[in-house]
Amino acid sequence: MSRLTLPKNARLLKRKQFVYVQRNGRCCRADQVTLRVVPSRHSNTRKVGITVSKKFGKAHQRNRFKRIVREAFRHVRPNLPGCQVVISPRGNSQPDFLKLSEELLQRIPEALPLASSSRC
C-alpha cells in the first residue's frame, strides 16, 4: 500500500529554512495564494512550507487551508523544477483544489528564472 502523504523531506520544517526562502525568494502572486520561490541547491529537491496567520480564521479553517495546499503541491511536485516554496493565503477564502494546482504548476516555474528578490 502506497502512502499518499507529502514526505517529511519534501517540507520546510525549520524556522531557518522559512527565513531563507522569505529573504532570498522571488515573490509571485496567484489568485488564491502568495508564493515565495527560491531555486533549490540540489536540482531535484522540491520543498514546500505553508504559513497561515491567525487573521485567516479559526484553527479548523487554517488547518483545512494547509491540507488543501499540501495535497495540491503533492500532486504537482513531480512536474516542478528543483525549488523551495513558501505558500501563504491571499484573502480569507479557502482555495479551490483544481485551480490551486494549476496556479502552482504555472507560477512556480515562472518565478524561478528570475531568482532575484522582489517585494510582494
Curated annotation (Swiss-Prot):
* One Pfam family in the UniProt entry: Ribonuclease_P
Q: Which reaction does it catalyse?
A: Endonucleolytic cleavage of RNA, removing 5'-extranucleotides from tRNA precursor
Entry keyword set: Endonuclease, Hydrolase, Nuclease, RNA-binding, tRNA processing
Q: Tell me the SUPFAM superfamilies matching this sequence.
A: Ribosomal protein S5 domain 2-like (SSF54211)
Q: What class of enzyme is it?
A: hydrolase
Give its E.C. classification number.
3.1.26.5
Does the keyword section mention Nucleotide-binding? Answer: no
Query: Its GO biological process terms?
Result: tRNA 3'-end processing; tRNA 5'-leader removal
Cellular component terms (Gene Ontology):
ribonuclease P complex
GO molecular function term, any single one: 3'-tRNA processing endoribonuclease activity
Supply the InterPro entries for this chain.
Ribosomal_Su5_D2-typ_SF, Ribsml_uS5_D2-typ_fold_subgr, RNase_P, RNase_P_CS
What is the protein's quaternary organization?
Consists of a catalytic RNA component (M1 or rnpB) and a protein subunit.
Described by its record, this protein's role is as follows:
RNaseP catalyzes the removal of the 5'-leader sequence from pre-tRNA to produce the mature 5'-terminus. It can also cleave other RNA substrates such as 4.5S RNA. The protein component plays an auxiliary but essential role in vivo by binding to the 5'-leader sequence and broadening the substrate specificity of the ribozyme.
Q: Specify the protein name.
A: Ribonuclease P protein component
Protein's gene: rnpA
